[in-house]
Amino acid sequence: SIPDYAGNNFFNTIGNLIADPRVGLMFVDFQTGGLLQLSGRATVEWAPRDSHDPEALRMINVEIDEVIDRPQAVGLRWERRQNLTRALKVTRRVAESAGITSFYLAPVDHLPLATFVPGQHLPVEVHLPGRAESAKRSYSLSGAAEDKQAYRLSVKRKEKGQVSRYLHDRLRVGDEIVAHRPSGEFLMPPGTDPLVLISAGVGVTPMLSMLHAVANQPARQAWFLHGARNGKEHAFRDEVAHLVKDHQRIGLRVFYSQPDKDDQQGRWDYTTGRVTAQRVLDLNAGATAQYMICGPAAFISEIRRGLQAGGIADERIHFETFGPAAS
């Protein structure tokens, strides 16, 4: 039996099996190089009882027709690494905006933190009340990569997000959380090509880590474009302003879609409206510029299409989507 999980609530694999129940399974033992191949027919158990996995919403049962065992068929050999997780303690909590809170996490064992590349995220495990299994999430590292004392995770509270609600409502200074090594492929491009950082909402978090890195690169030109509903929901406003004020080579553009009365008093510079591809293109960042985009899926799709239509090559457009799976 194979468990199937909710994911994004679309059981695509099950749909395929209903149309054609034939399945092939392959299992690799990377320690010995063994390869086990199974073929058969599958049925879907829509309401599993006494499941071995309480997180599974469906079970796929396979009746095996044929088995092929191929010892040492694979040339690769892997070994399981031990102690892949470590305990981190919350040393600070900072409310960054109306819905985003930063958690500073320092190692309990006082050993050095694993390094990360700006743009990467930190996988964490959280034990929620009433659940036997830990909930796993990944949150972008929003602090400077040079900070060796603590990681900073900046999390948006979502009403339907079990983990984000727990972090905001229950996790306090002194509490511990389990974390894996930083990972992720949404990386700040190396070199000196101009960099355009484009974000909306909580998508600002990986961009902030990149902005810290750019501020320490004296020869790199950059632009930081961010969209928020209003000033109350604009996270890291002071921090970004501080990073760019002494660097004429870093441009800053802020957009509020629904500015309130406090915003209209003029303390902060902003443009009413949203971040659009045309506004990005108007920067004239140059033929070698790299474009980093992070935010809701619709936002990313719109910016990407606009940049492509404006002649920006696909290999210069990099993006990461934030959605319900990250809550």
Region roles according to the model:
Residues 141, 204-216:
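Histidine-anchored nucleotide/phosphate-binding helix
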Residues 69-81:
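Intrinsic disorder at enzyme termini
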Residues 189-193, 286-287:
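Short helix-loop-beta connector
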Residues 80-176, 180, 194, 228-231, ...:
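Ferredoxin-reductase
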Residues 2-56, 66:
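Short, structured beta-strand-loop surface elements
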Residues 222-327:
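Reductase modules of NAD(P)H-dependent flavoproteins
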Residues 201-202, 297:
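Alpha-helix N-cap/helix-start capping motif
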